[in-house]
């Protein structure tokens, strides 16, 4: 399946900015990293919409489901990554969800964590399944509601504010919880896992682009973390849930993105068969 992002606003001027691309060195230097450290960063890890002149993006998928329209927002001066698309992991998650649409619908209303623009959650709704799409940032939640309305997905898709550091008493338990690239730091990974244990009554489907932190050692030499500490923290905090890798996809420069399923042994055993992507 081919998935392409393109600018839906007509006109050459808009089309020039309506693409998804990677910004590696410029973004690194914008965070104030020394140039020697920026030069050692791996392949692009975050794909962001160039939104200075953006008027709307359409996510083109196989039919069904039909395309998803993304409401515009200007992140050009925002270096936080909040509400942006982490494309490699999102692609893998969407591919699996679409390939197992019947199983997804059988799980009842599902829950997306850390949704950003909400592409996987809207895909689930366009497949005819109920889903609650969540994020912790009010601005992102507002944009999610706009995206759901833009695509006419109410009432299949609902949007809610969910802060992983706060109680979740307003939420039910879900047989399917999913998300992409949520374990980008140890603290948030542990908080995410705690919410998964509270809210998941079946399978947590998690797509993750493996990352190894680059840092400056005491001797001034650039060093690379031996393990993916964010993912390690999530898996440790999710215990006693067991983990099974469903598929993986190679990325440039030796990196990869993996799709993991976390759950009790019985829930993992009931998953549909899958193969390496």
Task: Please state what every model-predicted region is.
Residues 1-277:
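S-adenosylmethionine-dependent methyltransferases
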């Amino acid at each position: 399946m081919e998935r392409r992002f393109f600018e839906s606003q007509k006109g050459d001027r808009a089309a020039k900015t309506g693409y998804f691309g990677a910004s590696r060195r410029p973004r690194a230097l914008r965070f104030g990293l020394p140039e020697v450290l920026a030069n050692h960063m791996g392949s692009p890890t975050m794909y962001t919409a160039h939104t200075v002149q953006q008027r709307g993006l359409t996510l083109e998928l196989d039919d069904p489901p039909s395309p998803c329209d993304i409401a515009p927002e200007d992140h050009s001066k925002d270096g936080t990554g909040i509400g942006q698309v982490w494309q490699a992991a999102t692609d893998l998650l969407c591919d699996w969800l679409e390939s197992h649409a019947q199983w997804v619908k059988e799980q009842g209303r599902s829950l997306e964590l850390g949704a950003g623009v909400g592409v996987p959650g809207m895909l689930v709704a366009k497949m005819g399944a109920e889903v609650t799409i969540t994020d912790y940032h009010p601005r992102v939640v507002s944009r999610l509601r706009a995206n759901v309305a833009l695509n006419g997905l109410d009432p299949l898709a609902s949007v809610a504010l969910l802060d992983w550091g706060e109680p979740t008493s307003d939420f039910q338990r879900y047989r399917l919880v999913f998300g992409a690239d949520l374990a980008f730091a140890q603290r948030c990974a542990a908080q995410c896992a705690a919410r998964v244990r509270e809210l998941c009554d079946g399978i947590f489907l998690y797509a993750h682009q493996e990352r190894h932190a680059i840092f400056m050692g005491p001797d001034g030499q650039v060093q690379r973390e031996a393990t993916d500490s964010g993912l390690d923290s999530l898996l440790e905090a999710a215990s006693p849930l067991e983990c099974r890798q469903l598929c993986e996809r190679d990325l440039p420069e030796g990196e990869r993105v993996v799709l993991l399923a976390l759950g009790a042994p019985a829930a993992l055993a009931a998953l549909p068969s899958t193969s390496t992507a």
